[in-house]
């Protein structure tokens, strides 16, 4: 398995570097993740530190040797992340639900040799997930992985995001080479 770890949100340089050092010392983490841009449901919530946090990810690579990843949702994010040496890009659940957003990212990475991870959409819609994968693949990206985070559910549940395992199982059946 590929172990991805790090803070959901990059809040300070110290937080990012301290977390990365501790994870690197474990020797079990393959990819350091930190959210630089955070799409929030409502305005006036913390939406990430923005591109200044990308310099922190560069320092993580330099100081720990860990490869880095962050979520991108639009062209500017892609260009800034690549300019700062981010190793792997990921599409978040809120981006995956919007074919226009996925296409914008796909156009921005066309011709770039970078791995892309694609989270399942927020709602349990296999076709949306497949559509995102196909758009990224058609942009010339061959190293695609998927992240199953579970799905939103309106009601009582013991999980924040309900797994609905039949959906990722069907995805793997249709795309057996996906990681």
Regions from the PLM with identified roles:
Residues 101-179:
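Catalytic alpha/beta core domains of metabolic enzymes, predominantly
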């Amino acid at each position: 398995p590929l172990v991805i770890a790090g803070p959901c949100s990059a809040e300070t340089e110290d937080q990012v570097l301290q977390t990365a050092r501790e994870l690197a010392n474990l020797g079990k983490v393959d990819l350091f993740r930190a959210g630089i841009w955070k799409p929030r449901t409502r305005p006036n919530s913390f939406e990430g530190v923005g591109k200044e946090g990308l310099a922190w990810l560069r320092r993580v690579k330099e100081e720990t040797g860990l490869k880095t990843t962050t979520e991108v949702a639009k062209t500017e994010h892609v260009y800034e992340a690549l300019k700062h040496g981010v190793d792997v890009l990921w599409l978040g659940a809120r981006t995956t639900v919007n074919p226009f957003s996925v296409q914008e990212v796909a156009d921005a990475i066309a011709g770039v040799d970078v791995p892309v991870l694609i989270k399942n959409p927020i709602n349990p819609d296999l076709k949306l997930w497949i559509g995102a994968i196909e758009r990224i693949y058609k942009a010339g990206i061959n190293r695609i992985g998927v992240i199953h985070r579970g799905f939103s559910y309106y009601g009582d549940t013991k999980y924040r995001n309900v797994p609905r395992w039949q959906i990722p199982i069907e995805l793997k059946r249709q795309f057996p080479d996906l990681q």
